[in-house]
């Protein structure tokens, strides 16, 4: 539950950082003598409640946990414990009948799609296969939801004990390498990299 709570905080943090970056980019393009905008009262609870309306979360057990604990209201969840980028093209959710990625072709238009993959792929022999299949998954998501903003989450670190035991390459060194691959993939696909490491 603590990890799920942290992810919810990271989702909000990523959203805030994306908005801050957008504001900085707008500021850089502004005139030398900008006009002062009227003061606006910000209600962060309104932002938090509405930010995830018409959003979809797709991924592994992290997404499954978010769904089970109802941490993000107003979103749809398409998850399966142990799901990886390859299985998302062929396996259904635990309650579904179509492959996970096909759930985005449900007639609903999403504003945002949050994809959480990578941890189950850390032990793959070839990281190029991970990048290739994740890229295909992104392309499929774009084909179904062409106007949605897509976010790729970084893999969160593991405890020192888990990292030191290096079970199936689930260690922080490997996670950092895969996060760099996810970041580069996000750049090449024109989607957002959400650094929650």
Spans of model-derived segments:
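Active-site segments of SGNH/GDSL-like serine hydrolases
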Residues: 120, 142-175
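Substrate-gating cap/lid alpha-helix
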Residues: 160-196
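Conserved SGNH/GDSL esterase-like catalytic core that processes O-acyl groups on lipids
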Residues: 43-133
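Charged helix-capping and loop-helix junction motifs
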Residues: 128-137, 175-178
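N-terminal, intrinsically disordered, polar/charged segments of Gram-positive cell-envelope systems
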Residues: 9-54
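Loop/turn elements at helix/coil->beta-strand transitions in domains of secreted/extracellular proteins
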Residues: 51-54, 108-113, 145-150, 188-192
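Sec-exported extracytoplasmic/periplasmic mature domains
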Residues: 67, 118, 135, 139-146, ...
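Hydrophobic membrane-insertion alpha-helices, especially the h-region
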Residues: 1-8
């Amino acid at each position: 539950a603590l990890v799920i709570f942290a992810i919810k905080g990271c989702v909000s943090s990523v959203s805030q950082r994306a908005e801050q970056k957008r504001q900085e980019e707008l500021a850089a393009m502004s005139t030398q003598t900008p006009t002062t905008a009227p003061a606006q009262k910000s209600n962060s609870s309104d932002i938090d409640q509405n930010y995830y309306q018409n959003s979809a979360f797709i991924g592994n057990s992290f997404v499954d946990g978010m769904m089970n604990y109802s941490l993000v209201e107003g979103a749809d969840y398409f998850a399966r414990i142990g799901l990886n980028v390859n299985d998302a093209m062929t396996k259904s959710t635990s309650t579904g009948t179509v492959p996970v990625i096909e759930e985005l072709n449900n007639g609903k238009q999403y504003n945002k799609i949050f994809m959480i993959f990578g941890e189950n792929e850390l032990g793959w022999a070839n990281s190029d296969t991970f990048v290739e299949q994740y890229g295909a998954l992104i392309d499929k998501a774009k084909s179904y939801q062409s106007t949605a903003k897509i976010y790729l989450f970084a893999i969160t670190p593991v405890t020192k004990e888990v990292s030191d035991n290096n079970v199936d390459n689930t260690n922080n060194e490997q996670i950092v390498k895969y996060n760099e691959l996810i970041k580069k993939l996000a750049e090449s696909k024109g989607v957002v990299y959400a650094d929650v490491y």
